[in-house]
Amino acid sequence: MTQMSQVQELFHEAAQQDALAQPQPWWKTQLFMWEPVLFGTWDGVFTSCMINIFGVVLFLRTGWLVGNTGVLLGMFLVSFVILVALVTVLSGIGVGERSSIGSGGVYSMISSVLGGQTGGTIGLLYVFGQCVAGAMYITGFAESISDLLGLGNIWAVRGISVAVLLALLGINLAGVKWIIRLQLLLLFLLAVSTLDFVVGSFTHLDPEHGFIGYSPELLQNNTLPDYSPGESFFTVFGVFFPAATGVMAGFNMGGDLREPAASIPLGSLAAVGISWFLYIIFVFLLGAICTREALRYDFLIAEKVSLMGFLFLLGLYISSLASCMGGLYGAPRILQCIAQEKVIPALACLGQGKGPNKTPVAAICLTSLVTMAFVFVGQVNVLAPIVTINFMLTYVAVDYSYFSLSMCSCSLTPVPEPVLREGAEGLHCSEHLLLEKAPSYGSEGPAQRVLEGTLLEFTKDMDQLLQLTRKLESSQPRQGEGNRTPESQKRKSKKATKQTLQDSFLLDLKSPPSFPVEISDRLPAASWEGQESCWNKQTSKSEGTQPEGTYGEQLVPELCNQSESSGEDFFLKSRLQEQDVWRRSTSFYTHMCNPWVSLLGAVGSLLIMFVIQWVYTLVNMGVAAIVYFYIGRASPGLHLGSASNFSFFRWMRSLLLPSCRSLRSPQEQIILAPSLAKVDMEMTQLTQENADFATRDRYHHSSLVNREQLMPHY
């Protein structure tokens, strides 16, 4: 049996070795080797989320929150903040399962659903919010250092903030590998600081500073809210909400993860759950052991509770630095993705990256300058509402993205499930190539980047599609070679064209089908039935006593059967491809994603924005409208997004119209194709027939032949 020589790429062996080589873990990589570094669930997503959630607000404002809202309402406020963040995380997970998230994180997620114009607007506001949040974290760190050193001057606080910002800028420019290594160390120190606070609440007292220990009377006194002058539930909520703004940090790491489809959901949900538990512990312990006056006016009351005060201060400093570093990591990469997609042409220079991980040096410098500008504001309580409004607007966009994507997918009509008959044989020469892919959150590692779009991958697909064997010449007996009649020679000349076509595509017509069950279930029913009937007839003919020359002509009935149902098959295949966009993977967190909960979260977040600071909300919406129309004028050719067919206002109108009896339902409209009766069309032949090439077969010539015309000849 002879084997056909396969077409190989020039360096296909090296490409195969690179594709099969697994990326090394980050701790095994050499420090000064220029190679991309990818991370996993716990060292990448979980660490980044926890570092961003455990910020200045936890260490400096938890006691102030308990002193104003009390223990009971404080727990409710913390749970409500975490719930708003959890709804957004689940919405992001739902979008990631139905769509794809690139290296742009939040921007890529919103842009793929709502379009580049909306995604660019929300992405720029999110970057701005990250810069303001970084300034808030650095300011909190500088305030603590200045109090520790006895420096009450505001310029001392600003000088310390600028120095810390420059140090973090250097770490970010060094690469993501150093950021993750530093984050692991900082997370360990934060755990030690939290343990020191919990142990200190049991081991000692400090009545002079309001730490009097556990007392039922004290806990009862601190249970109900008692606000300071000028404070309310929503002002406290506005100050405390930035504590949960780090939940989207895992989505911003999509380009630096080995398996983003599995790492982002698991790491983000684990970080949210552990953070909620630790926040509840802090609120309960502070309300049970400290007086209300100390909780209100002493921002460092938790430092008096700790067993070793310097460990708590170390955790405060580390949390401030880590949260700011997380903002300096995510914001430049979002800005880089916006620049690479040319959403705003003026920012195209920020799309360049250096190193194997494409570190956005220019974007890091720009975000650092914006952060430095807000450092000079110098007050945490002033910066916190600005951060809250920007992040709440981003959460509204993410929640609405998942809702619109779900509603758009529900509006699709389902494709009928294919029914396969037992014992039926199908095509062996064409397996289904629309294999279901896992949801992509960004980079899939170097393995896929090597294979995608290369000749090696094309050859692999062709090997799967066509069995590269020539069983026809070796398996069929050669009979009657010596006594050939003119009729057999004529029959051989007739099949020359079809035999050449068969050899060109290397069809193996006698091989049994090899469709996997899970792949065959996704093929259209009409296509399966047509192929079964065609190939069942051919199998029965090939097993009979037929001459050698008629075997190649069995391809003609197959082409005839397929040409009759080609229109219906094309429609079903196109509908199948359209519905593949909305297929969801099954996992334990898939059932937690609900579009109606996302819609409720979007509406609730929008209302909370107006209640906290309606002035900041109106300013943000005005800026968003200006940026939106500017992007529409500067880049009019941006994609519309996966949910462009869904309109919230049309959906609301369709719900409200049946309830309004006075309004008539819209009449059905039918669009008719224009008639072309006045246009005459005729076919002509460009080259005239002559005797110069009479002996040459007619290649590249097609004709439509009915089954009835062919049957008398065979």
From Swiss-Prot:
It is linked to SLC12A8 has been identified as a possible susceptibility gene for psoriasis mapped to chromosome 3q21 (PSORS5). The gene is SLC12A8. It is a multi-pass membrane protein. GO terms for biological process: cell volume homeostasis; chloride ion homeostasis; chloride transmembrane transport; potassium ion homeostasis; potassium ion import across plasma membrane. The chain crosses the membrane at residues 37-60, 72-93, 99-116, 123-142, 154-173, 185-205, 233-254, 266-289, 309-331, 360-377, 383-403, 593-616, 622-643. One of its GO terms (molecular function) is potassium:chloride symporter activity. Residues 533-548 have a biased composition (Polar residues). Belongs to the SLC12A transporter family. InterPro entries: AA-permease/SLC12A_dom, SLC12A_fam. GO terms for cellular component: membrane. Keywords: Chloride, Glycoprotein, Ion transport, Membrane, Potassium, Potassium transport, Symport, Transmembrane, Transmembrane helix, Transport. Residues 471-503, 530-550 are annotated as: Disordered. This is Solute carrier family 12 member 8. Pfam families: AA_permease. Ubiquitous with very low level in normal skin.
